Amino acid sequence: MSNWLVDKLIPSIMRSEVKKSSVPEGLWHKCPSCEAVLYRPELEKTLDVCPKCNHHMRIGARARIDIFLDAEGRAELGADLEPVDRLKFRDGKKYKDRLTGAQKQTGEKDALISMSGTLMGMPIVVSAFEFSFMGGSMGAIVGERFVRAANYALEHRCPMVCFSASGGARMQEALISLMQMAKTSAVLARLREEGIPFISVLTDPVYGGVSASLAMLGDVIVGEPKALIGFAGPRVIEQTVREKLPEGFQRSEFLLEHGAIDLIISRGELRPRLARLLAQMTGQDTPEQAREAAAVA
């Protein structure tokens, strides 16, 4: 073996391999919209919103609750509930195996997390869908956790906010999943009768049985920028009606323009703007008014 190969080439290759392995995995993230390569710690500061094109990336349910609620005084509702394969359903794979896989992947028992806490000092209860868990599909446990959150709002007379991100009813639970549409709609009717505010925040994507029930029943319906919202997907609709759909069809901006939702709020503005809105809806001081009153006192 030549001296050049031993002294120069091999050490150079080894240094290159060491350098590659020293870069932590997940340190960089490519924006799916503009394809900008973003430094992960900087992206976290913008709440997973691309600083180049303002694309709102999908985030997990716990991350969403973490950036929305105050840090202190949180309590999870229905955390002990776990899904059961009552129908022994099987398509290409057993439902119980799909559940096990989703639980390992996400660290969650099912696709909805409900939590009580405060929003800028205001008592509140929040539910958030975990889209990574079987597409955020709604089955019996998702429905029950949502109902428990709504019952908490009824008992404590505090507002409720739900962040939806779902493909719809869970196919593997058949009629049990469809029943959750009626179950969640019924408890929201009770909130409305009692005059307790419910704000629905639609994030990318919201489809199927979730969009046909709880997601569109808010006293105020908010969309994140460019979120996909609908019942069936655009391609399915185009194939059915045999027509080309308008530009931006089913995006939150299109729905706002046509009166289907009330507001579009960027992720970084959700916390202060919903706090002000809920304060007005409940007759409480806004966070700004509370600070002014405390300063005067």
UniProtKB/Swiss-Prot annotation:
Alphabetized UniProt keyword annotations: ATP-binding, Cytoplasm, Fatty acid biosynthesis, Fatty acid metabolism, Lipid biosynthesis, Lipid metabolism, Metal-binding, Nucleotide-binding, Transferase, Zinc, Zinc-finger
UniProt keyword Transferase, yes or no: yes
Catalytic activity: N(6)-carboxybiotinyl-L-lysyl-[protein] + acetyl-CoA = N(6)-biotinyl-L-lysyl-[protein] + malonyl-CoA
GO-annotated cellular components: acetate CoA-transferase complex
Pfam families given in the database record: Carboxyl_trans (PF01039), Zn_ribbon_ACC (PF17848)
Signal peptide: none
Binding site for Zn(2+): 31, 34, 50, 53
Domain CoA carboxyltransferase N-terminal, residue spans: 27-296
InterPro entries reported in the protein's UniProt record: AcCoA_carboxyl_beta (IPR034733), Acetyl_CoA_COase_Trfase_b_su (IPR000438), ClpP/crotonase-like_dom_sf (IPR029045), COA_CT_N (IPR011762), Znf-ACC (IPR041010)
Pathway where this protein functions: Lipid metabolism; malonyl-CoA biosynthesis; malonyl-CoA from acetyl-CoA: step 1/1
EC number, as in UniProt: 2.1.3.15
Cofactor list: Zn(2+)
Residue intervals of every C4-type zinc finger in the record: 31-53
Subunit structure: Acetyl-CoA carboxylase is a heterohexamer composed of biotin carboxyl carrier protein (AccB), biotin carboxylase (AccC) and two subunits each of ACCase subunit alpha (AccA) and ACCase subunit beta (AccD).
Protein name per its UniProtKB record: Acetyl-coenzyme A carboxylase carboxyl transferase subunit beta
Species for this entry: Pseudomonas putida (strain GB-1)
Gene that specifies this protein: accD
